[in-house]
Amino acid sequence: MRPSSNLVAASAAALVSSASLAQNANDRVSFEPFFEAGQSMRYVLDLDATIKQKEGEQRAFNQRVDQTITLDFEVVAVDDRGAVIDAKIIGLNLGAMWGDRMYAYEWPRLTTDVPLRLPPIVILEKMGEATRDARVKVRVDRSVDGEPGRVVVSGFEDIAETLEGQDVFDMTVLGLLANEQIADALTGAFFVEGASGKQIRKGAGWQTEDRVNLGPAGAMDIATSWVFASLEQGVATVRGTPRATIARPASADPASPSARLEAQESSIEVKWNVDLGRADSRVSKQAMTTVWTLGPLTLSQEQDTTLSVTRKN
């Protein structure tokens, strides 16, 4: 996310072209990001994730993370690969479950109430203060030769250290507060999977595939069916329907855990601003129940997650 304040002429021309010609008379759209040095933008990232785990007949263990992060961005350089962007956190709401109750940290604080100095409040405050101090850099590399574009983020490396020496929360409470998680969220603001570097006609569909490693239990393969659903007033709506399957290792060890999907429902909707060359919004929803088995032990995990990325004027 670093370098060059020099504008490469050929690259700039290509980027300007991709914005001005992003939509043509045949209702084709190029889902490519467009950047100019000095551009500013604001995005709000919102995560609401609930996990319910139950082992056998034992009482269920519930976790919930509810976060809202508001970031101001300024494009500081454009080069032949993409853009270098400075980001500043201007708003932060961190919520997490401890026991059966939600606790929260808010900045700037909109209420005058002083929260009790309970352990979860203290930890959330440490997380929040470390996040506010983060010097965030973003590098956006556009699609080249058919390779998908990517986003790389730095600045959140120290947030996890605030969880050391405590036994209230596990790492799940970090939610979005990690370089990789912020990068994944912003990828949805600047790219549409499987559409980078292509002119796509309204009504067209395509498919993307991804794999998540599950260790000795195998892998989760996710196939997403996409469709360019509509184009109205310069905003293209793209919808995705992910479907997951679990692939067991070819030679699975009987002593290793196994997993199966019991239920799933997922959806993605992107509102792409053709003139700006980035998403006005992206909402991803996933509800999934996974059953893990190891010998006589069975663990059921229900996960319900909504991640939204919204551009603000």
Q: What is each model feature region?
A:
Residues 1-11:
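Bacterial N-terminal signal peptides that target proteins for export
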